[in-house]
């Protein structure tokens, strides 16, 4: 579950991480009031207006701007709220901005130069261990750093049996080139950041940039946070942070009815039981020269009602030109699934206007094929994996 920057900063602050202070606003009037409050509390006279969407790269998309007075706060907020923000991490349509964060200006002059770093904590799925990824090249262009100078990005793996050790935090601070008070501040920052990551059951905490201020303080200027969905049952206070408006509406609807659905950009809808078979089916579609429109795992109870619900979910995507149903009958019987497909097709009537290709293997697969072939419905059946792909290709080539 992704959350907004301001929510991520709230979590960080609760674990003792120094953050760039800010107040969220839903409209320009609230934005001006937030700026006035910040001036009272922090003394700042310049402000940063930051679009709150679940995507990185907001600065490049025009979603982060500096305001030097209250009038500019109002004007910039009016520009950003309601805009379709397009960044390297959004679709071509972008994301609509519903709120902004009015933050204090922390790039003030002082005895030393400011520096920006990149630090994230996440799970290394290859080793099964948490790790801290860090770089001296923090800021908007971290993607460019990763692509062209990957040697500037380092990582520190954490042994789960002992957790983050003090020497590891010191090593990171040393590798970032810090000394004196800034070194001590960074060690404390890393320790608190890791505690926030563990304590909130997060799957990622990305801070970009981490700022060394001109008076050698270390603070989080941004926060991109993902909370593990599977841990929300024990993190109810974070579950309330979900912003449905930021999520794909089809995915939200699918989740409400218990379907595991992920929207993609292709034209071939997929209805499969089991995540592994679903991914293999998507690969097959790509090998056939097409792109999958979704990942959809119907699970082990593919009755008529569930199949019909899955059909309706898939067809909400206007880009879908064909649907491939690929079911392996282990516990679930193939004939039951086939009857569900036929019944769903009858119930939906003219709602289904795209070719349907069904491949059923496993328990009662022969009976299932007969059911489909004798149904009188314009449903194509296949036995082999490649045969199903060929039928998809033939259907879309007409």
Swiss-Prot record:
Molecular functions (GO terms): ATP binding; magnesium ion binding; succinate-CoA ligase (ADP-forming) activity; succinate-CoA ligase (GDP-forming) activity
Alphabetically ordered keywords of this record: ATP-binding, Ligase, Magnesium, Metal-binding, Nucleotide-binding, Tricarboxylic acid cycle
Nucleotide-binding in keyword set: yes
Record-linked InterPro entries: ATP-grasp (IPR011761), ATP-grasp_succ-CoA_synth-type (IPR013650), ATP_grasp_subdomain_1 (IPR013815), SUCC_ACL_C (IPR005811), Succ_CoA_ligase-like_bsu (IPR005809), Succinyl-CoA_synth-like (IPR016102)
Enzyme Commission number(s): 6.2.1.5
Transmembrane segments: none
Cofactor(s) it depends on: Mg(2+)
Binding residues for Mg(2+): 208, 222
Enzyme type, top EC level: ligase
ATP-grasp domain sequence ranges: 9-253
GO annotation, biological process: succinyl-CoA metabolic process; tricarboxylic acid cycle
Pathway(s) it belongs to: Carbohydrate metabolism; tricarboxylic acid cycle; succinate from succinyl-CoA (ligase route): step 1/1
Subunit: Heterotetramer of two alpha and two beta subunits.
Family recorded in the similarity comment: Belongs to the succinate/malate CoA ligase beta subunit family.
Protein name: Succinate--CoA ligase [ADP-forming] subunit beta
Organism annotation: Flavobacterium psychrophilum (strain ATCC 49511 / DSM 21280 / CIP 103535 / JIP02/86)
């Amino acid at each position: 579950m992704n959350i907004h920057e301001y929510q991520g900063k709230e979590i960080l602050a609760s674990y003792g991480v120094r953050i760039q202070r800010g107040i969220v606003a839903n409209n320009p009037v609230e934005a001006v009031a937030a700026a006035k409050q910040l001036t009272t509390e922090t003394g700042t006279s310049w402000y940063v207006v930051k679009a709150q969407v679940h995507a990185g790269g907001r600065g490049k998309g025009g979603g982060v701007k500096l305001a030097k007075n209250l009038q500019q706060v109002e004007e910039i907020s009016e520009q950003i709220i309601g805009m379709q923000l397009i960044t390297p991490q959004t679709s071509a349509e972008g994301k609509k901005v519903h709120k902004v964060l009015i933050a204090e200006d922390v790039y003030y002059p002082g005895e030393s130069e400011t520096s920006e770093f990149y630090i994230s904590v996440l799970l290394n799925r290859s080793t099964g261990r948490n790790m801290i990824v860090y770089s001296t090249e923090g800021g908007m262009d971290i993607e460019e750093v990763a692509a062209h100078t990957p040697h500037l990005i380092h990582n520190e793996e954490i042994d789960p049996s002992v957790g983050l050790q003090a020497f590891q935090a010191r090593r990171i601070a040393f590798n970032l080139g810090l000394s004196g008070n800034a070194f001590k501040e960074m060690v404390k920052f890393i320790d608190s950041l890791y505690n926030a990551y563990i304590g909130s059951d997060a799957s990622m905490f990305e801070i970009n940039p981490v700022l060394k201020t001109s008076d050698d303080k270390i603070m989080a200027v941004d926060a991109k946070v993902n909370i593990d969905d599977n841990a929300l049952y024990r993190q109810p206070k974070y579950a309330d942070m979900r912003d449905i408006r930021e999520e794909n509406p089809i995915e939200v609807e699918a989740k409400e009815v218990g379907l595991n659905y992920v929207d993609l950009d292709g034209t071939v809808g997929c209805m499969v039981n089991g995540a592994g078979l679903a991914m293999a089916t998507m690969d097959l579609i790509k090998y056939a020269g097409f792109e999958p429109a979704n990942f959809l795992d119907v699970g082990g109870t593919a009755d008529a009602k569930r199949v019909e619900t899955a059909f309706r979910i898939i067809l909400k995507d206007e880009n879908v030109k064909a649907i491939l149903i690929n079911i392996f009958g282990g516990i679930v019987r193939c004939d039951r699934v086939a009857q569900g497909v036929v019944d769903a097709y009858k119930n939906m009537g003219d709602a289904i206007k795209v070719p349907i290709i069904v491949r059923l293997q496993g328990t009662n697969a022969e009976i299932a094929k007969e059911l489909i072939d004798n149904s009188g419905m314009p449903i194509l059946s296949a036995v082999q994996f490649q045969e199903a792909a060929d039928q998809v290709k033939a259907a879309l080539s007409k």
